[in-house]
Amino acid sequence: MHYIFHDRGERETLKPLSWTRPVADLRVGVTTLREKWSLRSPGSTFSYHSAAYLAGSFDLSQPEGDAVRHVRGCLVATNALVDAVASLRSGQQLVDAKGEWLASHGADAAENVVFADSVLLMRRPFDLFSANSEVLEADFDLLTRGRSSAPLSGTNTLIGDRIFAEEGAVAEASVLNSRTGAIYLAAGSEIMEGSLVRGALALGEGSQLKLGSKIYGATTIGPGSKV
């Protein structure tokens, strides 16, 4: 499957975040919007229908074919959505209960297929924050299902059972409380001594929480960040 993610009107409503990237490359929960589709559709490829000036950094190619699906970039993927999009026949478009376009098989699709389940659309910057807790929990389940966490140092106080560390994640002498939300530590991330974390938290690859940090409420820290 090849997904083409369309910015549509959300390119304007998500500014300034969308100045430097396509809408589907924005992060909510643990992963970007695009990665949520890729994780649920292994082996898939993707490109973007976005501003021309982004072509130097992002693939803006527009291939055609039976395996190509056009997807609204601000749409948060679920297993049911991925299945519904994959099932579209040529000329069909997936719409929500209000008739809003979600995806299509073919750029000029006109036959509506209604997706009855509720959907999450990241239309404005505040949507990324208000939906972060819900999406982070879903991402955590997807990323950790059937897997075991890498061990964390015995110097930590770990509360709850929704703490997952990828290989190479490090935490020392800190308190991690997952009873209020999942805590996901990506590869190479680090929580320095004396930090207090009350989930939910997604700490990106190579990111750091500095000495004595206090984190609470659903928080996403992207790759390579220092807090």
Predicted regions and their residues:
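Terminal amphipathic alpha-helical/low-complexity segments used for targeting or macromolecular assembly
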Residues: M1-D161, G168
